[in-house]
């Protein structure tokens, strides 16, 4: 029996020796949750669970015939959600009980108000793969993917937050699990301009090695477009990242065109950013392939947000696992991703962002007219004479009528 704490819920995981039917219900005054598990007995030590920061005060157990009853005495009311998990490579049958804070459910699907203010930050959603009961791949020396990628994600956020005009948003800040769709939902909630998912690869052959960068395949894009158009819930959502275009009031043809345009633009930006990151990583690390790869990963399927996935190396390879767990290598990888992101957005910033404003100022020009002098032009445009000379590669102050000068940012 284990417990994981996330910002909006606590997850209790019960390891089972086999499948078992169960039911959950709540009681009031005081707040309690009752979990009945048929044909079961309890072997876990409830006193050692570590409930201090959870909404659970204590857990009591009892038997009703062959049914095991667990009563969770709560510190405050929560909303339970339970489900079964089938065995995987690490765990056997499991029963999962998620306890959601009541106020978080109402907020979970709400998208933040679009940042329409000129000069806003470019928002990067940074997704550290796996977490909680899902450790991801486990490499030599028990290096866990979920730990390595969270460290890289935090370093990437630190770099972005230190750069004027950029803001990093982590999909998870600690060791807890978020569903695949929940990760992209979190990106949309923060009006992200880009979604970056960070992972570490694994393969049965420990000789496999190399980092890779992935974007959504065309097959994955077409299937996701159909899913969005077929879903009333999705069609009422936003497209266009921080825009506010809704599909729910459009006929099918127009909705299809709008969504296709959004996905095309998103995939073009994804490829551009992915190529830059691929180039940066291969300067210090071996790449699994010499090009950006494509697949239908669920986390890449946002129709309105450019999305990429970075496999930072094979954690199943002892040499790469040793690198991935070091702070210096994690910083190198985060720096390569950071540079690829910034390189793209400096070339193609979203509208109304601080970077777009700065680029517009950098692109100002002035056409010389009769009577102009270089010093007068500098004064008119609020820039120094030295900077005006430098940006135009002028060796002296001689200019000609009709000559077009670049005006540097003031």
Residue ranges and their predicted role:
Residues 40, 129-133, 165, 313-317, ...:
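Short connector loops/turns at beta-strand edges and beta->alpha or beta->beta junctions
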């Amino acid at each position: 029996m284990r417990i994981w704490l996330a910002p909006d819920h606590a997850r209790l995981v019960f390891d089972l020796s086999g499948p078992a039917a169960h039911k959950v219900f709540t009681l009031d005054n005081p707040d309690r949750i009752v979990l009945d598990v048929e044909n079961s007995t309890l072997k876990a030590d409830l006193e050692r669970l570590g409930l201090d920061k959870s909404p659970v005060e204590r857990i009591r157990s009892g038997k009703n015939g062959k049914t095991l009853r667990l009563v969770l005495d709560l510190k405050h009311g929560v909303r339970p959600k339970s489900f079964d998990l089938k065995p995987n490579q690490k765990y056997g049958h499991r029963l999962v009980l998620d306890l959601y804070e009541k106020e978080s459910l109402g907020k979970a699907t709400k998208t933040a108000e679009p940042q329409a203010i000129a000069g806003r930050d470019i928002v990067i959603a940074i997704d550290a793969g796996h977490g909680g009961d899902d450790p991801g791949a486990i490499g030599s020396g028990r290096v866990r993917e979920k730990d390595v990628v969270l460290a890289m994600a935090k370093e990437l956020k630190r770099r972005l937050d230190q750069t004027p005009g950029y803001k990093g948003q982590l999909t998870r800040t600690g060791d807890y699990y978020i569903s695949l769709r929940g990760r992209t939902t979190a990106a949309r909630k923060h009006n992200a301009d880009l979604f970056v998912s960070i992972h570490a690869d694994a393969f049965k052959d420990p000789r496999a090695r190399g980092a890779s960068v992935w974007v959504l395949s065309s097959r994955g894009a077409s299937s996701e477009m159909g899913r969005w158009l077929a879903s009333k819930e999705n069609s009422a959502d936003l497209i266009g990242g921080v825009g506010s275009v809704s599909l729910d009031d459009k006929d099918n043809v127009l909705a299809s065109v709008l969504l296709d345009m959004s996905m095309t633009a998103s995939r073009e930006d994804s490829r551009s950013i992915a190529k830059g990151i691929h180039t940066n990583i291969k300067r210090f690390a071996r790449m699994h392939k010499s090009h950006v790869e494509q697949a239908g990963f669920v986390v890449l399927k946002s129709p309105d947000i450019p999305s990429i996935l970075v496999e930072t190396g094979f954690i199943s390879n002892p040499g790469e696992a040793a690198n991935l767990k070091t702070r210096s290598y994690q910083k190198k990888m985060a720096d390569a991703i950071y540079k690829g992101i910034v390189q793209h957005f400096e070339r193609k910033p979203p509208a109304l962002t601080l970077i777009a404003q700065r680029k517009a100022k950098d692109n100002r020009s002035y056409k010389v007219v009769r009577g102009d002098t270089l010093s007068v032009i500098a004064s008119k445009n609020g820039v120094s004479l030295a900077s005006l000379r430098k940006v135009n590669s002028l060796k002296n102050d001689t200019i000609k009528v009709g000559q077009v000068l670049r005006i540097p940012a003031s």
